[in-house]
Amino acid sequence: MRLIPAILLALVATSPALAQSPDLIFKKSTVFRLLTPDDKLATYAIDDPEIEGVACHYTVPERGGVAGGLGLAEEVSDVSLACRQVGPVKFKAKFEQGDVMFRQSRSLLFKRMQIVRGCDEKRNVLVYLVYSDKLIEGSPKNSTSTVPIMPWGSGEPPRCKDWLK
């Protein structure tokens, strides 16, 4: 019976959405606190693990204070997102509309932030959406960013519709 949780944990841990950690670009204090950590905005970068040549930057609020310093504060759902083509686009595998590109816990137990991807077939544009959800209910707060797939060097750019499942 103890084997089932271990197997589930192994499956979750090997997911491409969890395989990489974002790179911290910088943090900026927004609320000064004298004896505890300040509230901050933190900007991170992450490469799409399934599509080479695409990177996303996102900014999240990080709570300070005693609860934030101990990692117990529930973070708010405000997240901004910007994704860009940073090199030649190369698809590593087929994907489905709405596949999770990145997932991160935003509270001790229940809240998580997710970046999902899709393909606008008509315009050959990758579409990224970031949102937060909870065990019971999610937040309507979200941000969307698009990446038109452009030629990089010589040759035609790939068509994202050819890589949809």
Language-model region placement:
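Mature extracytoplasmic domains of secretory-pathway proteins
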Residues: 55-121
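C-terminal partner/receptor-binding element of secreted or periplasmic proteins
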Residues: 123-165
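Active-site-adjacent core segments of small-molecule enzymes
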Residues: 40, 110-117, 122-124, 136-142
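N-terminal signal peptide c-region/cleavage motif recognized by signal peptidases
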Residues: 13-16
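N-terminal secretory signal peptides
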Residues: 20-80
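Broad, structure-driven detector of short, well-ordered beta-strand segments within folded domains
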Residues: 41-45, 56, 115, 125-130
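Sec-dependent signal peptide recognition
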Residues: 1-7
